[in-house]
Amino acid sequence: MRPERLTVRNFLGLKNVDIEFQSGITVVEGPNGAGKSSLFEAISFALFGNGIRYPNSYDYVNRNAVDGTARLVFQFERGGKRYEIIREINALQRKHNAKLSEILENGKKAAIAAKPTSVKQEVEKILGIEHRTFIRTVFLPQGEIDKLLISPPSEITEIISDVFQSKETLEKLEKLLKEKMKKLENEISSLQALYTAIWKYLEENDLEVLKSELKTVSEKKKELLKKREELQKEEEQLKRLLEKYRELVKKKERLRVLSLRRNELQKEVIYEQKVKKAKELEPLFREIYLRQREFERFSQELNSREKRYKELESEKEAISKEIPVHRERLSKLEEIGEKIKEELDLLEKVLKASRPLLEQRIRLKENLTRLEEEFRRLVGEKEKREKELLSIEKTENETKNELEKLLDELSILKKDHMKWLAYQIASSLNEGDTCPVCGGVFHGKVEAVEFNIDEFEKLDQKRSELENTLNVLKERKKSLSSLIEDLLMKIEEGKKNLKSIRNQIEKIEEELHRLGYSEDLEEKLDEKRKKLRKIEEERHSISQKITAADVQISQIENQLKEIKGEIEAKRETLKEQREEMDQLKSDFFDRLRKIGIGFEEFRILVKEEVKDAEKELGVVETEIRLLEESLKELESENVRDVSEDYEKVRNQLEALSQEISDLERKEGRLNHLIEETLRRERELKSLEKKLKEMSDEYNNLDLLRKYLFDKSNFSRYFTGRVLEAVLKRTKAYLDILTNGRFDIDFDDEKGGFIIKDWGIERPARGLSGGERALISISLAMSLAEVASGRLDAFFIDEGFSSLDTENKEKIASVLKELERLNKVIVFITHDREFSEAFDRKLRITGGVVVNE
């Protein structure tokens, strides 16, 4: 992974940083607490969504971020492809957004993942390592630059195990292995139980015995099938005889029923003759009925027209009485209308004279409303700013108190800091070395000093932040005081303007009162106009009513004349219809007397349906004749009842079929048992094979468990293989960086790593500061590449401030050789003198890059 660019906003101590990485060495320099060490954490968080210090992602947001949001943009190259990651962490809303894209050759971006979890998974696929391995290989923390180089063999084994075999990973692996073995134990136990059950089943069900029993059952079934076939033939013969007997009985019964029906039909034929004669008179009866209905309809119409004639005469009389009343109301409305018009003219003159004053009053009231709103706004703004000023004063006092406590705490820590710096310088000196501080010769043993430098830098950073906060609060306080004074002046000016406008409005209202204007003048005008319109509408309506009444009387007179003619014509028609109907009734009753039927009997007969009983009688007599002939033929064959013989044979057949069915079920059960026995024999062989395979697998896993978690065996073997790969890479780096001067090897008996200087062995602790740093970095990079593949970037957090100027220059000149590796190498230091030795450097102060 080769970093290209990192943009950071409000992440830990970094407020606003934009860095472009280049091949070679870059030195990041700045005071303690400036945010230098946060650069690597920003890269780690951008890639994996995890830092190093805190488990909670929202703790990485800078506490002074106004919007509570941290933003990271990281561009890098891997395997010939370029990628970009964008992450935003909002601590206020508890939101974490992430997006991973590939940067294409045309500059466009193709999205790969858009959620924190999926981005982390895709990054792990691209880099081929997880977060834990990344932070243990790509980053060399403060104070550990030569830890691996000078450690004894036991510690080297622990360091390698920590990188490649974390305790958590081994515990997880051991747990999985135990679960797998437990699962295998359960499966083997289940299979063994199944094996025992199958073996028991095969012992209980002997295959040869089952086959012999099946043969006996099949032979017996064959005999019974033959016997059933003979009985079925006998049953068929008896069935035919029984059917003939039943046919004879059935025909005799049918003959008896038909004889009775023939007697009934003979009576029905006589009755139907009367019905037919009655139906011949039905058309005449219908005509009389229709003539009667027509006569009644005409009578009703005549009564209706006579009634309508009387109604029209009454309606004409009522309308004639309404017309004089309408004319009197019309005259009164004309008088009222003239009076309202005079009142309306007077009110319109007053309104016309008042209109200029009214328009002026409206404009003044609008200005008054606008000024009142502005006045209220200014008063509200003043109160708001006064509250804000009180809040700032409170915050200022709290910040001062916090700063005083912090300064007291820092004063105590600074004394321990000086002791710790002295210890750091002394611990790097050997017996007889020149002290870089006093220039004297170093003698004696170094006494260890414990000091939490991270806590000291954190408190110092907090002090700087509190001082900046106090300055900001003072400026804001001054600005608010000035703003409140301006608001007070504007409020006084607003009061004067409001009073002036209210006086002008009062004078205009006095003048309007003098003219006779009142606030409801326009309402009175509208009311008068509405009354006038209402009177005009009523006058128009009454005029229309008078005209309509005259027209209505004329129409009624025409209708009366027309209805009178209709009444006379209908009376003449009714007289003619009565004479014709009397003649038809006389003819009808004469014909009824001739055929010997009374009127009531006629009404019953005419409703009857003619069923043609005479035709049915012929059919019945024909069927009786045919049945008598058929019965003679059957009686000549001596047909008898064989139902008892038939039932006896059927019962024998049913019993035989049941026995055959029982044998078939037994035959099926035996076939199933034989198939099941054969299947279980095959299953038994398969189980024997599977049990052997699973037992072998269990033994292999048990062997793996014994060797994998035995530190005396596996760890020594694993460390040896890793060291072979690490030393091979380190030798190659040293050959390039020192032109073949230095070589490195590992000897467990000689206490760890052995350095060869032009072939002469030297202990690692005997190297100069620059030589040791160069070899340590080469060794650390080699270990990182073995763990994570090809390594194109390396970050080193190491201070060299304890060295004098000459030693710093020596170390810097040696470390410059790392430029030849064509990698991105970043040194993080708070020593400006050390950083000046390098061409490319960044200075970070207060969380921002101040120069490049």
UniProtKB/Swiss-Prot annotation:
**GO BP annotations listed:** DNA repair; double-strand break repair
Q: What class of enzyme is it?
A: hydrolase
Cofactor(s) recorded for this entry are:
Zn(2+)
Effect of substituting R94E:
Decreased DNA-binding
Q: Which UniProt keywords apply?
A: ATP-binding, Coiled coil, DNA damage, DNA repair, Hydrolase, Metal-binding, Nucleotide-binding, Zinc
- UniProt-annotated binding residues for Zn(2+): C435, C438
GO cellular component terms, alphabetically, are: DNA repair complex
Paste the cofactor note: Binds 1 zinc ion per homodimer.
Reactions this protein catalyses: ATP + H2O = ADP + phosphate + H(+)
**Which segments of the protein form a coiled coil according to its record?**
155-345, 389-427, 460-488, 534-711
What is this enzyme's EC?
Answer: 3.6.-.-
GO molecular function term, any single one: ATP binding
Family annotation (PROSITE patterns): ZN_HOOK
Q: Which residues bind ATP?
A: N32, G33, A34, G35, K36, S37, S38, R53, Y54, D59, V61, R63
User: Which residues does Mg(2+) bind?
Assistant: S37, Q142, D797
**Which stretches make up the Zinc-hook domain?**
389-488
Ranges that cross the membrane: none
Record remark on domains: The two conserved Cys that bind zinc constitute the zinc-hook, which separates the large intramolecular coiled coil regions. The 2 Cys residues coordinate one molecule of zinc with the help of the 2 Cys residues of the zinc-hook of another Rad50 molecule, thereby forming a V-shaped homodimer.
**What binding partners and quaternary form does the record give?**
Homodimer. Forms a complex with Mre11.
Question: Which family does the entry's similarity section mention?
Answer: Belongs to the SMC family. RAD50 subfamily.
Q: What does this protein do?
A: Involved in DNA double-strand break repair (DSBR). The Rad50/Mre11 complex possesses single-strand endonuclease activity and ATP-dependent double-strand-specific 3'-5' exonuclease activity. Rad50 provides an ATP-dependent control of Mre11 by positioning DNA ends into the Mre11 active site: ATP-binding induces a large structural change from an open form with accessible Mre11 nuclease sites into a closed form.
Q: Which PANTHER family match?
A: ABC TRANSPORTER ABCH.3
Its recorded name reads DNA double-strand break repair Rad50 ATPase
UniProt organism field: Thermotoga maritima (strain ATCC 43589 / DSM 3109 / JCM 10099 / NBRC 100826 / MSB8)
Tell me the name of the encoding gene.
Answer: rad50
